[in-house]
UniProtKB/Swiss-Prot annotation:
Role description: Probable ion channel inhibitor.
Provenance organism: Chilobrachys guangxiensis
Keywords: Amidation, Disulfide bond, Ion channel impairing toxin, Knottin, Secreted, Signal, Toxin
Modified positions (Lysine amide) in chain numbering: 77
Domain of life: Eukaryota
Notes on the domains: The presence of a 'disulfide through disulfide knot' structurally defines this protein as a knottin.
Protein name: U14-theraphotoxin-Cg1a 2
Signal sequence segment: 1-21
Tissue specificity statement from the Swiss-Prot or TrEMBL entry: Expressed by the venom gland.
Propeptide residues according to the Swiss-Prot or TrEMBL record: 22-49
Length: 77
């Protein structure tokens, strides 16, 4: 009787570990997708701030480089 109870408990623990591991993989792929979308939005916002190749961005410390604003770059260098 004690052996069967122990086996049931070990089985439940194994299933729980497997489900938890499977869930974290799903969450990681969802997180990757969300990060990709948010990164794309940030890239689009950066392009919108640029006036053109190596132009000055709206922020005085920013400079356009390949139509993306980059922090602490000096235009023309």
């Amino acid at each position: 009787m004690k052996t069967s109870v122990l086996l049931v408990i070990l089985g439940i623990a194994a299933i729980t570990v497997q489900c938890t591991a499977s869930e974290s993989v799903k969450q990681d792929s969802l997180r990757t997708f969300v990060d990709a979308v948010l990164g794309w939005n940030a890239e689009m916002a950066s392009e919108a701030r640029c006036g053109g190749w190596m132009a000055k961005c709206a922020d005085s410390d920013d400079c356009c480089e390949t139509f993306h604003c980059t922090r602490f770059n000096v235009c023309g260098k």
